[in-house]
């Protein structure tokens, strides 16, 4: 009877806890994979935007991640 209680405890409590930890890791891996797919210019723009910095736009093509420079 005690052995059956131990087996039930493992199956009903410990096994679901182990699987929940694995599920929690998946969004982080997916986020990292999406970041690797960005080209370097997009990645740089995202980082500069997060830091609150802006750079000059190339060839006068101004948008929200940069500002127009007179030079």
UniProtKB/Swiss-Prot annotation:
Miscellaneous section: Negative results: Shows a very weak inhibition on Nav1.4 and Nav1.8 sodium channels. Intracranial injection into mice does not elicit symptoms.
Notes concerning its domains: The cysteine framework is III (CC-C-C-CC). Classified in the M-1 branch, since 1 residue stands between the fourth and the fifth cysteine residues.
Keywords noted in UniProt: Amidation, Disulfide bond, Neurotoxin, Secreted, Signal, Toxin
Single Gene Ontology MF annotation: toxin activity
Signal peptide: 1-24
Record InterPro entries: Conotoxin
Entry comment describing in which tissues the protein is expressed: Expressed by the venom duct.
Designated name of the protein: Conotoxin mr3e
SS bond partners: 56-68, 57-66, 62-69
Lineage: Eukaryota, Metazoa, Spiralia, Lophotrochozoa, Mollusca
A single Gene Ontology CC term: extracellular region
Keyword Signal in record: yes
Chain positions with Aspartic acid 1-amide modification: 70
Positions of the propeptide removed during maturation: 25-54
Cellular compartments annotated: Secreted
Family, per entry: Belongs to the conotoxin M superfamily.
Main location: secreted
PTM characteristics: Has been found to be amidated by Han et al. (2006), and to be unmodified by Ju et al. (2022). Ju et al. (2022) describe a disulfide connectivity (C56-C62; C57-C68; C66-C69) that differs from that of Han and colleagues (2006 and 2007).
Pfam families for the chain: Conotoxin
């Amino acid at each position: 009877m005690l052995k059956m209680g131990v087996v039930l405890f493992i199956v009903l409590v410990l096994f679901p806890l182990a699987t929940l930890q694995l599920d929690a890791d998946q969004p982080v891996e997916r986020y990292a994979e999406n970041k690797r797919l960005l080209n370097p210019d997009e990645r740089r723009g995202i980082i500069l935007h997060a830091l609150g910095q802006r750079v000059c736009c190339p060839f006068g093509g101004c948008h929200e991640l940069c500002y127009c420079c007179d030079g």
